[in-house]
Amino acid sequence: MMELEKELKQKMEEITPIDRQVMEAAWKNWDGLCKPLRGLGWLEEALVQIAGIMRDDRPHPDKRAVVIMGADNGVVKEGVTQTDQSVTMQVLENMGNDLSTACVMSHQAGCDMIPVNIGGLTDGVHPKIRNRVVRYGTGNIAKEPAMTREECVKAILTGIEIVKELKEEGYQLIVTGEMGIGNTTTSAACAAVLFGKDPADVTGRGAGLSSEGLNRKINAIRSAIAVNKPDPKDAIDVIAKVGGLDIAGMVGCYLGAAICQMPILIDGFISAVSAYLACMLNQTAKEYMIPTHCSAEPAAKMIMENWEWKHRFMQACIWEKEQVRLWVCL
């Protein structure tokens, strides 16, 4: 086992289950209110879960961060997207300048936007962008691995460190997010491997692909799996071979949240795939995750059903984390 994997294993040993006794106390608090018992349904359950996560029966996660993992994906060369890779860094810069939809809704939900450049083609310019580049873009998975195993582990560790930094800065709740042209392709590739499905069964239109573009996307994923032969039982192998740096970074965020005992919200398809991969590395990390909705992408429903998560706030296909911001407002 390489040194970085040993380091990752040691960090994951810090993850412990959430506090059930605190959750019982939180339920008593809720049941003592003048309202129908369990009247808020899944939202009430999630708030009690947050109590157990934070070890506080009356939690107030007032300082919140939306962490956007930005990275470019070489599979764009296969014509699987509507835009080129330059858009990834453009959007990260816009986030730094508070000019994106995500920024507007984050502010409305009382969240600070934290754009992280973990694998863009260039360094971020705006001072709000946290440049933690593991490598400048990934390989074209249709022809080669996305990255080396070592780079994958380094990206996961980077995600963990970002969350630890935010904890030290006083943040109490994390929302996951990503920005990476081509990442619905890499996420669908991971899902196809993990669930043993034909790519056609797990691949959607992403940001509005035409039928021709969708076929290119499916074929690119089939090629990626055939060329790289990822091991479905090895999360790191799957990410390194057919995933992306944004996915690896988000995996680290989920693990980091569990290590730091912080609630972390899952938003959208790519976030859900990353959450699933994180739980392959440490199953207890799931206790710190809160699903906010079920994406319209085909594989998202598979993940939610596999985990028996029924808290589907909405079935949507809105981009830049709008759904999770609505959840935080509630």
What are these regions (language model features)?
Residues 2-330:
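N-terminal loops that bind phosphate or other acidic moieties
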